Amino acid sequence: MSDPIITFDHVVKEFKTRGRGANIARAVDDVSLTIDRGDIFGIIGYSGAGKSTLVRLINALERPTSGTVTVLGTDITSLSETKLRPIRQKIGMIFQQFNLFSTKTVAQNIAYPLQLDHWRKDYQDRRVNELLEFVGLSEHANKYPSQLSGGQKQRVGIARALATNPEILLADEATSALDPETTTEVLALLKRVNEEFGITIVLITHQMNVVQQIAGRVAVMSAGRVVESGDVYDVFAAPQQPVTKRFIATALSGLPEEDRVERLHHEWSGRIVTVLIRQKDVSGTQGHELKASGQNISELIAKYGVESSLLYGGIDTVKGTAIGAITYEFNGPGWHVDEFLRELAANSDVIDFGTAAKPVAYADAVAGHASYAEDRAHDPLAADTATAPAASAAAHEGANA
C-alpha cells in the first residue's frame, strides 16, 4: 500500500520574464505527481525542463501559482514561514556545487544545521562524529573544503544534510560535477542513506544513468510537464515519449552511438536496426502490458525469410533485472523486412536506422518517430521497395526534397 510523503496536485508555477515586453513564463505546467515514503524517486529532464523549480516547491523556496503541494501530510502551499519551519527541518538538501563554508572545517560544516537549531554542544559533537564515520571522512574532520576532492566535498554535503535526521533528502544535480567513478561512489552512499535510515530521496538530474543506478521510480519532465513516469525498469524497457527515448539512449551501453551507426552503414548494405531486449513483462504507459522481448526474434526471422547479422550489443542491469540492446543488419525484400519489423515492434522497442542508401537521421530513429503501421497506411509503395526505409526516413527524405 502506498504511503505518499510528497504530492503535487495540478501544480503550476509561473514567473514574469525581465526586460521590455515582459511575459509570463510557465516553468511548471499542471504537474500531478506522488512520491511515496521510502522511495528513491528520480526527476529527469534537460536544462529548462522545470525540474529544479519543481524541487524548490517541495521545501517552499518557491510557491505555486496554482495547485497544491502536500509534504509530510501538510498542504504547504500557503503556509507562513513560521509554520513552514518544522517541515523544512525534516527536509535535507544537497547541491551540485556542494555549498560548503570555505572558512569552516569539515566538522564545522556538518555541525552548522545543529547550531542553527540550538542543539546542545555534546549532542552536536556526537552527531558530527557519527556522520563523519558514516560518510567515511573521520580522518578529515579538521580539514577545510579546499583540501578535499569533489567526491569528499559531496560526502560532507550529504553528512550536513543528514545532521537534523530529515525524512526527505532533496538531491539537485548532486553528481553533475563529479567524474563517473566518484558519481558511482556518491550514489552508493545515497542508496545506503535510503536503506539504513529509510529516508525518501528525490533525485533531480539530467543524467539517466544516475536514475538507472539507484532510483525505484522516475518522472521525465519536458517544457514544465511530466511527460512520462513510472517504475524505472518499465520506463527503461518500454519508453513511450521521444524525450524519454533520447535519455534512455544515453544510458544503455548496448545502443550504438551515432558515429558507430555511420560506420555500420558504410560496412553493411542492409537495414540497420537496434532492438531493445526486455527480460520481464512491463506495464506500458497506455495501460497495456508489454511482454518480455527478444525471445521471438529468431522465430520471426524464419517466418518472414529475413536474413540477419548480429553487429553490436550489450546488457545493462536496472533494479537487478537485465535490459539490453542488440543491433542487427536485416536483409530481404522490402515488404518482408517491413512486416517482420512491424510484428517485432508489437512487443519490442525497435530503433530503425534505415539503410546506407536511405538512412534515418540518428535523432529521429532514437526518438522513435518511426511507426510501421502508419508507414503501411500512408506509403502504398513500401511493399514494392527492395529496402524500404522506416516511416521516419521516408518523412525525413520528403521533408528535405
UniProtKB/Swiss-Prot annotation:
GO terms for molecular function: ABC-type D-methionine transporter activity; ATP binding; ATP hydrolysis activity. Keywords: Amino-acid transport, ATP-binding, Cell membrane, Membrane, Nucleotide-binding, Translocase, Transport. It is a peripheral membrane protein. It is an enzyme of class 7 (translocase). Pfam families: ABC_tran, NIL. Belongs to the ABC transporter superfamily. Methionine importer (TC 3.A.1.24) family. This is Methionine import ATP-binding protein MetN. It comes from Bifidobacterium longum (strain NCC 2705). The gene is metN.
